[in-house]
Structure formats: C-alpha cells, structure tokens
Amino acid sequence: MEAFVISRLAFLVAVGLASFAGSVVLGRRFVKQPERLRVALWWLLAVILALSCAWVNGGWPFPPRESQHWIGYVLLFAALLRSIDLPTVQLISALASAALGIVVTLLPIAQNGWGPVMLGSWFFVSLVSYLIVRVVLHKEFEIASLRASLLLAVPLFVSAVMLFFAGSAMLAELAVAGGIAVAAAYLSQRSSALGHGFVEITLLFHFLLLLNCTIYADLPPVLAWLQWIVPALVILLAQPLHLQKWMTRRGHYIAIVVGLGVAECVVGLLFYFVVKPTAPS
C-alpha cells in the first residue's frame, strides 16, 4: 500500500515538474516567436496528459479497449488540428475534437444496449454543452492571468474529488494530474502564449473525464453538467459587474475568484447530499 501511494505521488510530482520545466524551456526557445510558442505549449500539455492517461491506464493500448483509453488519443488529435494553419480547420477544430471524444466515449455502451435515439440524444446534449462552455470562455483566455488559470485548474481539482467518490479512482487521478499540469504551466509561463489552443486541450480533457465517469461510473449526469458549466457560469454572472462604472478591474477579478469558489462549494454540497459518497472499494 505504501509503495502504491509513493508511486502515485511520484507520478503527480513528475507531471508538475514536466509541465513547469517544459514550459520554461519552450518559453526561452521561442521567446521571439510567440506563434510557435503557442503551438509548442499546447503540444506539451497534450503530450503530458496523454502520457498521464497511459500511465494511469497501465499502458497505451491500440486499438483502445475501453472508452477512457481514448482520452490521450483525442487530446493529441485536438493538438494536431490546432496546429494546422488553415482558417477552415481552425474554425472546426473544437467541434471536430469534441465530436470525436464524445463518439469514442459513447460507442462502447451504445454497442451494448443503447438505441439510436438514446445515442443521438446523449451525443447532441454533450456536444452542445461542450461548445457552450468553449464559446463563453473564448475571450477569457487572451492573456495568461491568474484568473484564467484558476478557472481551468480549480474545477479539475474539485472534479477529482467527485470522480473518486463516484467510483473512479483512475479518472480522479487523471483530474489531479491535469490540474497540476495546468497550474504548473501558468506558473512558469505568464504570457498570452497560453492561449486558446492550451485552453482547448484542458477543457476537452476535463470534459471527457466527466463524461466517462457519468457513463461508466456513478456520477449523476446533472451534477456532472453543473460541474462542467461552472467556469462559464461564473464568467456570465460577473459580466454585468464589469459594466458598472464603480467596479474596478481588481474588483471584477475578485468577484470572479469568489464566484468560482462559491459555485464549486455549491456543486460539492449538492454532490455530497445526492451521492452520499463513500470511498470506492
């Protein structure tokens, strides 16, 4: 048991160090090439998260045997699409990546009892939910502020607790790894280079973790959906404050951070009372 815990802690430390050191090295390598730095950083995150999936899954099976084995492949596919410098590809990259991730997640259960209507309903609702959050957060990540990093990392850490008590310790470990990777990257690279490609990889990763736990473990769909929309909801609720003349930039920043904390506490309490969590066996 002690060796198991040590190996897991070592894995999480390695993720943080790789993300931090990799971001520092890439920042110095492409200091005068911001566009190349953007591409390099989202590839770094995609590779780190894909390797994390392989570690947690005990290998990199091909073809994947379970839905969660697909997560790493989907992230690399998303990074590849974002790297293609064509306007059309850039426009559809989020749609194509999310659609692929949803299909490979739903396909195993669809082959074992779901009808076309059920499959289509889940696909449509999942895709719309992903795109809504993606669109709402689009402008938030033009610069790499502490606020932006909190909107990405904090929900991942909260989701890790929910995933664990919903019956999936493996997905919970991946969520923690994702939160650490994102936080480390923002600590080492405070520039606009951590833009939309980086955000897209992070959001897609978080979304697929929640979807997998909803379908194949015991995370209630409504709670998963609420947890998913928390960052977008916080931004939308804070927008009217930004328009007030008396609201300073710092005040708006504090309002978003406080709103994020309150929203996550509410979701956590709902999860506690609905699921009545116990440690998975």
Regions found by a protein language model. Give the residues of each.
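Long, hydrophobic/aromatic-enriched structural stretches that serve as scaffold segments
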Residues: 46-107
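N-terminal signal-anchor module of multipass membrane proteins
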Residues: 1-63, 257-281
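Juxtamembrane "helix-exit" motif on the non-cytosolic side of transmembrane helices
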Residues: 54-60, 105-112, 161-167, 213-216, ...
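C-terminal transmembrane helix-loop-helix hairpin of multi-pass membrane proteins
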Residues: 1-14, 170-177, 185-281
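Hydrophobic cores of alpha-helical transmembrane segments in multi-pass inner/ER membrane proteins
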Residues: 12-24, 71-84, 98, 121-134, ...
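Cytoplasm-facing juxtamembrane segments at the starts of transmembrane helices
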Residues: 33-46, 86-102, 115-123, 132-207, ...
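Structural signature of hydrophobic alpha-helical transmembrane segments
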Residues: 3-18, 58-75, 110-127, 169-179, ...
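Hydrophobic alpha-helical segments that drive targeting, anchoring, or assembly
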Residues: 41, 50, 56, 61-76, ...
